[in-house]
Amino acid sequence: MHPLTEYPRPAMRRDSYENLNGPWQYAITASAQRPAGWDGEILVPYAPECRASGVGRTLQPGQWLHYHRYFAPPAGTGGRVLLHFGAVDYACAVQVNGHLVGGHRGGYWPFTLDITAQLNGTGRNSLWVAVQDPTGHGAQARGKQTLQPGGMFYPAQSGIWQTVWLERVPENYIQSLTVTPDYDARTVTVKAHTSAPGGAANLWAVVRAGGVTIAEDWGSDEAGQDGTVTLHIADEYFFPWSPDTPFLYDLTVGTTQGEEEQFDTVHSYFALRKWSCAPDARGVLRFCLNDKPILLNGLLDQGYWPEGLYTPPSDAAVERELSEVKALGYNLLRKHAKIEPQRWYYHCDKLGLVVWQDMVNGGSRYNLWFVTYLTNVLQPLMRRLPDKAPLWELLSRGSESSRAEYRRELADTVQALRCHPCVGCWVPFNEGWGQYDAAGAVQAIRALDDTRLVDEASGWYDQGGGDVYSLHNYFYPLRVRPQTRTVALSEYGGIAWPMPGHEPPRKTYGYGTAKSREELTARYKKLQLGAVLPQLQKGLSALVYTQLTDVEDEVNGLFTYDRTAIKPDANAVRSVNAALAAEFAKVIK
C-alpha cells in the first residue's frame, strides 16, 4: 500500500518525483543507536499512535522511534538527489547508507536534505530516520497534543506524518521560491534562490491564464543569491481571487546558463487579491477583500482524523471535506493549533476558502486555570492583561530558549505558507497559550509578510495591536461595540451532540449539549439568527463557529469525526448562512 501518492508540494512542482510513502520497518527503543532488530512494519506517513499506521503505540518522552527502508534513486543520471520530508514530529536525524546526512527540529515544517554524496550507485540504498518527541515535556509547538487526552486536548502523535519523497534536480537548481503578487500594481514578483554552484545563472518566468501565456520575462541571479523577475498582468487578464471567483494563474520558473542550456524548471501558481480593513458606507470598520467589504463566515478546523490523527486517509477525503464546507455556504476556515500538509492549502486555494492560520501553540505546561478557565469567567477583566515579562512564566514562556523557539517557529510558518493565496490572516497566539510580547510577534510577521491581516491575540490577552478585535464567547450574551480594529467573533458556539451510530466519545465535551438532530439544528439557528445576525450592523465582520468536525471527546462538530454525516440539518445551515450574507450586504450600505 502506498498512501497519499499525489505530489505533496503543489506550489513548487517538478517532473522528477519518487514517493517513499508505504511500509517501512520500525522500532521503538530507549537509545538513539540503530536497533539490533525491528518491531514490525509501519505505514508511512501515519504516526505510530494512530490506527492507520498499523502500530498503535505511543512514543514516550525519552524514547526513540526508528524508521528504515531501502530505496532506489529517481530515474536519470547526474545532478543532485534531494530527500524531502513534509513534516516529522518532533526532532530527527537522518542517515543514508550509514552516513548522517542531516536532521531537523520542529514537528510541523518541511525540510530537504541533499543526499547525493551518500548514494552508493547500486540502486539499493538504506534510509534510516531516528525520531524523538518530548510531547508535554518541552516548549516546542505541539498544538492540542497531549499524553493524557481528554476534553479539548487530544492524543499525541509522533514521527513522520507527511509525505516523504525524492527528486533528481540539476547541479544548479532552484532551492525555494518567493512569489509576491501586487493587486494594485497588477504585477507578480518572483524571487528564486538557487544553488548556482557553477556561476551566475539566468532566471525566466512565464505566467499563464487558462493555458494562455500572458506574461514572461528574464532576470539574473548572482551565484547562490536571490534573483528576481517582476511580471505585469494586462488588464484583459486581470482576474482577482475571491471565494466566489478563486482564479489561479499558472507560473513556471526556470534557470538557464548561457543561451540554451536549461538547468531547472519548477511549476507554481499564484492569485491576485488584496486584504485590508476599511470603513463601509456607514463608517463601520470592515474586513475588505479586493477593496470590497466581505463577511468572513466560517468554522474552526482542527484537522484531526479518527484513523490517522494529523494525517488524512486520502487527498480525495480532504478535497471532499473542503468542498462540503463551501457547499454549506461558508467561506472561511480557521486552522486551529495545527499546520496542514501543503495540499490542504492548495485545495483551499482552488475552492476559494479563506484560511485564518494559527501559529501552533507551544511553551511549557499550561496553567489552564489562569489562561483558560478563569479568563473565560472573568473575560472583561482579563482581556487586556499585559503580556509583559512579569507574566511570561504564567503564560508558559518563562525561558529565553522557549521564546527563541517560538520566534523560529513563527518565521518557519510564514515562510512555509505565504505562497498560498487562501491564507488571509495570521494568528500568532490563541487564548494566551504560550503567549508573550504579542506586539513583537505582529512586527515580526509584518516584516516577513505585509500582505495579510494579523489577529494579534485570538480570544484574550489582547494588546491592542494587529488588525482584529478578536472575541471568543461561549457563555455570555453577545454584544459588539464599534472598535478601532475590525471585530471578529473568532470562536463561539460549540454545541455538542454525540450522534448515534458513530464512534462514541469517552466523555462528551462541548459548550452545551443537544439531545437530537432537531434540537441541535434549532439551537444552531437560534444562536446564528437570534444572537449573531443582529451584531453585524454593529461591526461584527468575521464569524468562526466551533467547529467543523467532532474531535475525539469534543463532539461539537457540524460533521461526525468519521466525516460520514452532517449532524444539523444541512438545508437549515445553508439557509442560515444565506441569511447572514444577506443581512451583511444590507448593513454595509
Task: Kindly give the residue locations of the regions a language model identified.
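Secreted/periplasmic carbohydrate-active enzymes, especially glycoside hydrolases
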Residues: 1-347, 351-355, 424-425, 441-447, ...
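Substrate-binding/catalytic cleft of secreted carbohydrate-active enzymes
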Residues: 332-577, 583-588
